[in-house]
């Protein structure tokens, strides 16, 4: 993670300010040293990294690298928004107890395995790339200041 932070610090020139929210996305070669199956990681409040080679390696006949990339982008963005139970407690019981800050719903883009290369070997169609109803409700309640 230290190397990722160094790369961001050398490249990033836009930050949030006023009403502007800025997201910094790094596309990196190689892999995350703490989990070599990770396809992406959210590592700061407005930053996440995508491991392009790992995403391409996860693609196969039925699932394109573009579909995987889209799912991982939305998943990591969800973490930046606070999903699941990051700094709040959801009124819905949808956090996977074995994978904190991830959904227990395989149809949600916040499902824990979305960011893992192993997950895509088990699919026979497009991966989820949208938030489920509980994720959307949590985001709505956060927007309203109720969480």
Regions found by a protein language model. Name each.
Residues 1-53:
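Active-site-proximal segments of metallohydrolase catalytic domains
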Residues 1-5, 132-137:
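Ser/Thr-centered flexible coil motifs
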Residues 17-18, 30, 40, 45, ...:
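Residue-identity detector for glycine
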Residues 32, 136-139:
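Short linear sequence elements within intrinsically disordered, low-complexity coil regions
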Residues 56, 60-136:
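The catalytic-center signature of Zn2+-dependent metalloproteases
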Residues 141-147:
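Pan-zinc metallopeptidase signature
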